[in-house]
Amino acid sequence: MRFLFPGLMALSLACAGLAGAAMAGPSLAGPNLAGPNLAQAQDSGMVKLETADDSRGWDAVGKLVLGKNGFCTGALIGPQLVLTAAHCLYDKTTGVQIRPEEIEFQAGFRNGRAVAYRRVSRAVTHPDYRYAATDQLDRVANDLALLELSQPIRLPSLLPFETGATPVEGDAVDVVSYAQYREEAPSIQEACKVLAGRRTALILSCSVDFGSSGAPVFSIRDGVAQVVSVISAKAEVDGRKVALAVPLAEPLAALRQALEDSKAASLRGGKTVSVISGGTRSGAKFIKP
């Protein structure tokens, strides 16, 4: 995985709860990845969705409050299902999973109020995700989690997003996220680009920061926004800030199966717990935002 993207430098998980632990990150050496797409890696156009009109159609994106561990971003992909990044579910200090009941999804949170509030009753990560992986790029692979809410969200104004096929290099994508210093309302960045891609990760020109982890990456097809990827980390390529995202199309089936397996285990007499892989403390380093 170390040479997945040549030229990738100083990877940093983008969970807001990690902001206080920022420190210089190691470089991942590799040949130059210069090119016409990377020359435009720092797209602009971040727009804050501060009003009901601004947010119309995006309220299924929400703030995921992680108990006392900060927040991430999540997206509703079913009445009772929220998609986010797997690393959001771990305490950054201990490496121990956060109990599902400590997590709250605040759909469409804006200026102190959410369209809907739901506690999480169950959380699963992708079966191949390893929080404790020593190689930072390995931590991006399969960095996906599926959360089951305590009750479905059924509101005419808040419809779950569809999911879609993985975008390819050169495709335009949108990202809706919360982040450090803009946690009171979501922001949208439209028409950033897929700069490079592999089966397990994408490099995007989108702007992300702590708190953006788990944010949905959208492709707009026939006027419909489809979630195609999830933000995992921020990084640098040849000195340019980029975002790393996890493709969704292939891993989603495994995530759904992990959730069903967790439910089945509970019915057999086990407790309702999150099914988390690799729960030991990580040695990952973080760069300053």
Question: What do the PLM-derived regions correspond to, one by one?
Answer:
Residues 42-56, 90, 96-153:
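Conserved catalytic-core segment of clan PA serine endopeptidases
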Residues 141-144, 149-208, 212, 249:
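Chymotrypsin/trypsin-fold serine protease catalytic domain
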Residues 57-104:
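Catalytic histidine site
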Residues 75-76, 207-231:
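Catalytic nucleophile loop of clan PA
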Residues 85-88, 228-237:
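Short beta->alpha transition motifs characteristic of CBS
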Residues 2-77, 257, 261-289:
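Protease-domain processing segments flanking chymotrypsin-fold serine proteases, especially trypsin-like
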Residues 65, 106, 218-221:
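Core beta-strand residues in small-molecule sensory/regulatory alpha/beta domains
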